[in-house]
Amino acid sequence: CVRFAARVIRGVRPEAQAPMWLRARLSRSGLRSISAVVDVTNYVMLELGQPMHAYDARHLDGALVVRFARPGETLTLLNGDVLELEADLLLVCDERKPLGLAGIMGGEHSGIADDTTTVYLEAAYWNPAVVQGRMRRLGFTSDAGYRFERGVDPALGPAAIERATALILAICGGRAGPRTDARAVLPARN
């Protein structure tokens, strides 16, 4: 992971619904409406090309880290699949547990729920090499994984965070914290 942009938004109204225009855009693109926050992250993915993930911040224990899976770890994904994790799977984790498969799909435990009021937004750049072939081997696909396999612009993360923040505040209310933007060495542009 060479770039990881994030922001916490507190005080969102969990009962808020995405406006009809946004839900219609998702539907026309083959995506179903899930919740206002998740709909916004999916819309921003369609609009800018940057996959995002939203976590329910109350289920995060400490700082997030990116690491490879350890022997014996398991993860229940948002699609309900329970995985026994293999050492070549890159994960987003908090200080105690895996939260999701990096660039592919988030975990069920930390996903946005009907009563989520504090959201942790993530927009990262995942190297295609750590995503390619993993979904096929695991037996499922995701829109994020599809895009990361083919490459996403490493510079898009901060813009995606800002766009998603503006939409979430307009639709769900809340107070946005500062944006964090962790970087490593970016790949050379051709």
Residue positions per predicted region:
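RNA/tRNA-interacting regions in translation and RNA-turnover enzymes
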Residues: 1-190
